[in-house]
């Protein structure tokens, strides 16, 4: 199966409706990851098929959880997941990609330019030191324990906003260690076509 068909089949299996032009741009993003990986150490994956599953389809599981959002912050964005795939598919959402690694933010800037993502801003720095970002949704993928995630980013969350933390196995221990002023709205298991591993998303809000 060629890569375009593999991506299309995965998107269909997830019940998502993504324009053909956006799918082409997602594959262009994979090309950029492959091109710059040796220089910037963006991903341990080298196989394109695995990149499509782990970096595209896995990131796209976020889309139903940012419905209605106008602004999103992707913390510890690294090589741009889930922020860049989300930005490609949701051009109506203003997305900030934040990472403390300057090599990775240099790549993110390049990717934003080459992919023509007018709705994306890249910020380099530690999240605790950032003050000029406010978001309806703050997301991360394998960034930090939930308690640290909400503690470090709470000042950047808009009133009425929420966190959407992408996790592997059900994070019961992390949930138990959350501060009293944060409540768990839901933890949903995610099905990623072609990925033989558990995935969950935790939706959290301030009390």
Swiss-Prot record:
Keywords: Cytoplasm, Methyltransferase, rRNA processing, S-adenosyl-L-methionine, Transferase. The keyword Cytoplasm applies. It is an enzyme of class 2 (transferase). Its main location: cytoplasm. Its EC number is 2.1.1.170. GO terms for molecular function: rRNA (guanine-N7-)-methyltransferase activity. It comes from the Bacteria. GO terms for cellular component: cytosol. It holds the Pfam family GidB. It is found in: Cytoplasm. It catalyses: guanosine(527) in 16S rRNA + S-adenosyl-L-methionine = N(7)-methylguanosine(527) in 16S rRNA + S-adenosyl-L-homocysteine. S-adenosyl-L-methionine binds at residues 76, 81, 127-128, 141. InterPro entries: rRNA_ssu_MeTfrase_G, SAM-dependent_MTases_sf. Belongs to the methyltransferase superfamily. RNA methyltransferase RsmG family. Specifically methylates the N7 position of guanine in position 527 of 16S rRNA. PANTHER family: S-ADENOSYL-L-METHIONINE-DEPENDENT METHYLTRANSFERASES SUPERFAMILY PROTEIN (PTHR31760:SF0). This is Ribosomal RNA small subunit methyltransferase G. The lineage of its organism: Bacteria, Pseudomonadati, Pseudomonadota, Betaproteobacteria, Neisseriales.
